[in-house]
Amino acid sequence: MACGLVASNLNLKPGECLKVRGEVAPDAKSFVLNLGKDSNNLCLHFNPRFNAHGDANTIVCNSKDNGAWGTEHREPAFPFQPGSTVEVCITFDQADLTIKLPDGHEFKFPNRLNMEAINYMAADGDFKIKCVAFE
């Protein structure tokens, strides 16, 4: 995967929403949105896989604590289509991150690192970001 957008000093607080809108490549295999303190401390590794790493049409979520990956969570909902424009909304609190998918489906992923602010975001893979908004 080519290196995509990286942003720091976001200071996203609990209850605030991070909206990411972009275009999925027509031949997409997977893409990644990482959120956390920095690249080694991620409260959310959000990885929709069209056909990658042995997964097909599956969202894989994980966390990374001081460079060590946690246990993967697989979400069966998969509203992504190659060649489409999508929007994902992410909010968090002390306990969980809530991910709202393009079709309105929501699921929770535990805030394993107990982050009180999200300062880092990175996007990579077969996804071209068009808009990032904070609400």
From Swiss-Prot:
Organism per entry: Cricetulus griseus
Phosphoserine, modified sites: S30
A Pfam family this chain is assigned to: Gal-bind_lectin
All residue ranges annotated as the Galectin domain in the record: 4-135
UniProt-listed PROSITE patterns: GALECTIN
Record gene name: LGALS1
Coiled coil: none
Protein origin, superkingdom: Eukaryota
Residues the record lists as binding a beta-D-galactoside: H45, F46, N47, P48, R49, H53, N62, W69, G70, T71, E72
GO molecular function terms noted in the UniProt entry: lactose binding; laminin binding; receptor ligand activity
N6-acetyllysine: modified positions: K13, K19, K29, K108, K128
Compartments where found: Cytoplasm; Secreted, Extracellular space, Extracellular matrix; Secreted
One GO cellular component term noted in the UniProt record for this chain: galectin complex
Designated name of the protein: Galectin-1
